[in-house]
Amino acid sequence: MRAVVLTTYGGPEQLEVSDLPGPAAPDPDGVLIRTAAAAVNPVDLQTRAGLHSAHGAFHPPMVLGWDVAGTVTAVGDRVSGFGVGDRVVSMSAQMATGRGTYAEIVALPADIVAPAPASVPLTAAAGLPLAGLTAWQALDALALPEGATLLVTGAVGSVGGLTVQLARLRGLTVVAHVRSVEDVEQARALGAARVIVGEDASTLPSGAVDGLLETAGLPRAVAAVRDGGRVVSVVPTRVPEAERGVEVSVSYVEQDGEGLAALGALVDRGELEVRSAKELGFEEAGEAHRLLEAGGVRGKLLLLP
């Protein structure tokens, strides 16, 4: 099978397409998925650069990628929830498992797979798993009551944009922080009640919100949270320091087929929008990494076999 592989840590130029042996059959509790698209995420860039090398030995050729959307081509003997031909999505924790999704065929446990939302193109659905589960689980960790005010940084990014939408569905009043005036209308369209523009935290109101969901690693954003409020960061390398009784924690995304199915149902009900930026071929994986590193991407960059 064709796959985008990494044989040594480094820049985007290290990514290349190679022919690898594909999985012959799924595990008894697993499925084989023919990839329609794999999304590009910041964690892929970090892994490629060697920033996560402490998490495990590097065994080249490494296949990157956490997100996949595609069609089931085979099911294990103990799998009852899926059949050949089903359209599905999944998030594979590549950094821990080594099961990357930049490949024509992906073998995954069935319990981390979910039906793909039927209301969007299958390729676009690849942008839902990692960003959606990150936002969903971080909001669970934040556990703000209905009616509370939540500040979301990076509010038009992949995770931030889904966080704004999901927070609104949970009855929270969302204050969105964006870096450019060009992003204000999009933040409002996603459901933000108020939008604040700025390059740093200096434009944020002091002590004005009940909670903060940090997706941008914004210095001093915790100042916007009231005394005794809550902060959850999804940027583990830039976690705000606790102060004034504010609870600060980090949310690490976990594989979750049931949660992903719930997110897909929200998409099909028209309550959650999945945004795509650009589709590129496997041969353009390096360019996709360059685009994401340059910043300013709104929606997911998708790699197609």
List the predicted regions and their residue ranges.
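C-terminal capping/lid region of NAD(P)-dependent oxidoreductase domains
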Residues: 271-275, 289-305
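A short acidic, Gly/Pro-enriched loop at the edge of an enzyme's catalytic core
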Residues: 204-210
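Mid-domain Rossmann-like dinucleotide-binding core that forms the NAD(H)/NADP(H) cofactor-binding site
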Residues: 126-200
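Residues located in well-ordered beta-strands
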Residues: 2, 16, 34, 69-71, ...
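NAD(P)H dinucleotide-binding glycine-rich loop of Rossmann-like/cofactor-binding domains
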Residues: 57, 81, 91-154
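Glycine-rich beta-strand-centered segment in the early N-terminal region that forms part
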Residues: 21-40, 52-94
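Glycine-rich phosphate-binding loop and adjacent beta-alpha segment
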Residues: 215-273, 282, 305
